[in-house]
Amino acid sequence: MGKLTLGHRGEASEPDFFRGVLGELVLTFLFVFIGVGAAMTDGATTKGSTAGGDLTAVALGQALVVAVIATAGFHISGGHVNPAVTLSLAVGGHVTLFRSSLYIAAQMLASSAACFLLRWLTGGLATPVHALAEGVGPLQGVVAEAVFTFSLLFVIYATILDPRKLLPGAGPLLTGLLVGANSVAGAALSGASMNPARSFGPAVASGVWTHHWVYWVGPLAGGPLAVLVYECCFMAAAPTHDLLPQQDP
């Protein structure tokens, strides 16, 4: 397992450093603009969380935008667009803490800008915020978000970072499919944000902060936990077993 790395002197002058931070800014802006825009267009929100209406359409929109944006940005910055993903990869030693802090700052700025632009373009229409479903308490919301984000990072590791991945290049698509499935599963719980930046922008633009902390604590706990579990229990440098028994000719 990789170690947490603060970063090194001169890292900011590396050619890919600024490109990566700028990439996260642009990619997160597009991700939030499209994702929140899809929720606003559908209008299927109850207390700000996706519930009722055409939930499938919203979930499909989330799945597609994650798959496409992650694929487009993978060679630029890794296509994180999510502070929980960035922190988790820092825990796994895949990105320095210095770089990850700037990635997260870019993600928050981009999410806010995207939501303010959406409000302006729609004539002041409220940006739907993530909110706990009726009967779901804050602690339950934290656990739900932790589980959903755990599944997200587990799939990222299994389909992108593990050298034994079954379908090279398909990781972003599979990750998007999981996000769509979680969006459906989480509609009656917390809305399945899995992404503090995705929750932050709408909250800033609308001024609604009720239980907003849930969408930080849950994802930032579940993501790194998934990294620790996968790195310790499932990661291997090379194949250790045959998927099918070998037959003698």
From Swiss-Prot:
Motif NPA 1, residue range(s) on this chain: 82-84
Q: Which Pfam families match?
A: MIP
Q: Any idea where this protein resides?
A: Vacuole membrane
The keyword Hydrolase belongs to this UniProt entry's keyword annotation: no
Keyword Transmembrane in the entry? The reply is: yes
Query: Can you name a GO cellular component term?
Result: vacuolar membrane
Tell me the leader sequence span.
none
On the tree of life, the source organism's domain of life is Eukaryota
- What residues form the membrane-spanning segments? 20-40, 56-76, 100-122, 141-161, 169-189, 214-234
Task: Show the SUPFAM superfamilies listed in the entry.
Answer: Aquaporin-like (SSF81338)
The way it spans or sits in the membrane comes to:
Multi-pass membrane protein
Which Cys pairs does UniProt list as disulfide-bonded?
none
Q: What is its main location?
A: membrane
What is a single molecular function from GO for this protein?
water channel activity
Q: Motif NPA 2 located where? A: 195-197
Q: Which GO terms describe its biological process?
A: water transport
Entry note about domains: Aquaporins contain two tandem repeats each containing three membrane-spanning domains and a pore-forming loop with the signature motif Asn-Pro-Ala (NPA).
Say which family it is in: Belongs to the MIP/aquaporin (TC 1.A.8) family. TIP (TC 1.A.8.10) subfamily.
Designated name of the protein: Aquaporin TIP4-3
Q: Which organism is it from?
A: Zea mays
